[in-house]
């Protein structure tokens, strides 16, 4: 059977699109067409009599089943798809390549929406950081903010609207940006370009489709390496319920976070480890687990204070929590973000409540083969339980290989050992 053929044509929101002769010839001789409802409304008058139209709607699997049927019965005729802007710029051509990798694809692009908005603003865009929030969650946008990208182009959707974006930025203290919004770009009757403060944008509604360009008001922003302990909100004002800054930074080093993807912070308390990790390594997916309900507000307050969006907070007993490997699901743990919980390749155990081995055993059901577990053992005459002995026993019983411990005495605080463990087959 011949492989499927696609001709994917980019269009703007203009109600009377202009096409070069080559593209007009493709349309005139086409038999099977596809696109969204908006695209159909724009090109309907150009379609030949008797043309078949396949709507692009969710679920996409249904759309591609129709494509497979059409390709099978079309005797080699291409499926002509209309898509927004440049079909290879976060566009439908990428979806076709992923879903039907053997298909033959020809693309006729036009300007994408962010290019059109930059043109209207007479703004160079070679230095623009691009983030797509169309059908995607916040992580890449969070990363762009934390890394203080000076110019961010954003593709929006009905959930990630300009107002929602502005509200998120204000919530986490990223106020030093102005927002440019383009609505219905390419449509001479409906096109609108606005330049607003974040406060103004957060209170307005914008028609779809739209896109956003954020421009930082300041070119430089300094961030300290290590957040002072006194800057955090604490649990009941108890300064001992926070991993101290020098220990915190050494713990992050032991976790090897530049080369990790998913960090679990078990016993997060104030969120200091998660927040420090979020700001220093914004590529990470971070899951913070804490049994005390009152800590949820503390972690959220600290995350907002230090501009650390995207920490997924889970409140409940970790040993009863639903994790990726929990089958059947036990008690669902509460997440404030609703993001899928990825399998960790870095785990910090900051609190164990006397159940260190049980926690480690559960972690091992989801830890990646190259993952690492880090635990800070505190020696204190006030604590009858020897946490180092618990760690050694757990590692031995669970078949973990230990790394070399790091011994630290910080001022007049109790001595600490930063301990690491790996799956034995990886050492």
Q: What do the PLM-derived regions correspond to, one by one?
A:
Residues 1-106, 115, 283-286, 290-292, ...:
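Class I S-adenosyl-L-methionine
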Residues 2-8, 21-22, 77-79, 149-240:
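A contiguous loop/helix-start segment that scaffolds small-molecule binding in enzyme catalytic cores
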Residues 14-15, 84-149, 319, 391, ...:
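Class I SAM-dependent methyltransferase SAM-binding "motif I" and its flanking Rossmann-like core
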Residues 212-217, 410-427:
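Core SAM-dependent methyltransferase catalytic element
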Residues 260-269:
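Conserved class I S-adenosyl-L-methionine
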Residues 270-282:
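Conserved SAM-binding loop of SAM-dependent methyltransferases across substrates and taxa
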Residues 281, 367-369:
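Helix-to-beta-strand junctions that scaffold the AdoMet/dcAdoMet cofactor pocket
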Residues 291-325, 332-334, 338-342:
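S-adenosyl-L-methionine
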């Amino acid at each position: 059977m011949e492989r499927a053929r696609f001709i994917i044509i980019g269009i703007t929101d203009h109600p009377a699109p202009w096409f070069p002769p080559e593209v007009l010839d493709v349309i005139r001789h086409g038999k099977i067409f596809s696109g969204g409802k908006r695209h159909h409304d724009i090109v309907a008058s150009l379609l030949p009599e008797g043309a078949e139209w396949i709507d692009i709607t969710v679920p996409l699997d249904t759309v591609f089943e129709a494509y497979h049927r059409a390709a099978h019965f079309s005797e080699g005729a291409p499926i002509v798809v209309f898509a927004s802007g440049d079909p290879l710029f976060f566009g439908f051509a990428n979806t076709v390549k992923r879903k039907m990798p053997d298909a033959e694809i020809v693309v006729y692009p036009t300007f994408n929406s962010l290019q059109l908005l930059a043109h209207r603003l007479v703004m160079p865009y070679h230095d623009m950081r691009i983030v797509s929030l169309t059908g995607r969650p916040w992580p890449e946008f969070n990363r762009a903010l934390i890394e203080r990208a000076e110019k961010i182009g954003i593709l929006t959707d009905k959930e990630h609207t300009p107002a929602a974006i502005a509200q998120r930025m204000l919530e986490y203290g990223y106020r030093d940006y102005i927002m440019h919004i383009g609505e219905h770009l390419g449509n001479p009757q409906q096109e609108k370009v606005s330049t607003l403060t974040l406060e103004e944008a957060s209170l307005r509604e914008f028609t779809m489709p739209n896109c956003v360009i954020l421009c930082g008001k300041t070119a430089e922003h300094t961030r300290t390496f290590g957040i002072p302990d006194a800057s955090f909100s604490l649990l009941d004002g108890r300064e001992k319920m926070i991993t101290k800054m020098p220990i915190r930074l050494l713990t992050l080093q032991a976790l090897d976070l530049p080369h990790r993807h998913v960090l679990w912070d078990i016993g997060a308390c104030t969120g200091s480890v998660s927040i420090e990790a979020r700001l220093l390594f914004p590529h990470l997916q971070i899951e913070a687990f804490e049994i005390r309900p009152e800590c949820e507000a503390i972690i959220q307050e600290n995350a907002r204070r230090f501009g650390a969006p995207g920490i997924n907070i889970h409140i409940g007993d970790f040993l009863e929590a639903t994790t990726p490997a929990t089958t059947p699901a036990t008690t669902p743990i509460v997440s404030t973000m609703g993001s899928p919980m990825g399998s960790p390749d870095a785990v910090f155990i900051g609190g164990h409540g006397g159940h260190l081995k049980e926690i480690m055993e559960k972690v091992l059901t989801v830890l990646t083969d190259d993952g690492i577990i880090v635990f800070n053992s505190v020696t204190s005459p006030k604590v009858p339980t020897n946490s180092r002995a618990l760690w050694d026993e757990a590692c031995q019983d669970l078949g973990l290989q230990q790394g070399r411990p790091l011994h630290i005495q910080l001022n007049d605080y109790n001595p600490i050992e930063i301990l690491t463990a790996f799956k034995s087959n990886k050492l």
